[in-house]
Amino acid sequence: MPQPTRLSMLAIALATMLTGCAAKSASGTTDPHADEAAIRQTLADVEQRINQGDIGFVDVFAKDAVIIAPSTPDIVGFDAIRTLYSGIMQTMAMNVHFSTEEVVIAGDLAYEHGTFTLKMSDKATRKVLQDVKNKHVHIFKRQPDGSWKTWRMMTNSADAAAQPK
């Protein structure tokens, strides 16, 4: 069973689950409003898949995706990300809720930032091991087919830092 400290870092990384989404118009050009709507809907879809225990949510990551979380090495590449979440989901039940504060489209890159809450429970005992609120930034890269994939993601705690005494 993973140590709670490691679980904290892995839980923080969980915010990255955005599925690929396409928003090309009939003329083949991109529409920033449609891209933003697709990214927001994608996050809602990923939330549902995670809460149902569907490991397929990881298909949202680009092959060269990187998860950057505090106090843990970067998780680099699709295979490493899939391995990470497969291991977690074998023993943990997760309940996540995303809140998007902003989506900005800039050509073939876009970013989304917001917060998420995550509760992780041991599947065998149902004991809650993590119950956190975090902030996140996702950077998406438009794929050749027009879909968006999570390319980079960074998370940190939404709790105020402890004040020195």
What residues fall within each predicted segment?
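C-terminal motif of bacterial Sec signal peptides marking the signal peptidase cleavage site
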Residues: 18-20
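Short beta-strand edge/turn micro-motifs at domain boundaries
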Residues: 22, 133-161
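A solvent-exposed, acidic/Ser-Thr-rich amphipathic alpha-helical stretch
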Residues: 33, 37-38, 42, 54-106, ...
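Bacterial N-terminal signal peptides that target proteins for export
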Residues: 1-9
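A short, structured loop/turn motif at beta-sheet edges
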Residues: 103-110, 141-147
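A short hydrophobic beta-strand element
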Residues: 108-118
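Bacterial Sec signal peptide processing site at the extreme N-terminus
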Residues: 22-35
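Hydrophobic/aromatic beta-strand elements that line small-molecule binding cavities or substrate pockets
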Residues: 81, 85, 98-103, 116-118, ...
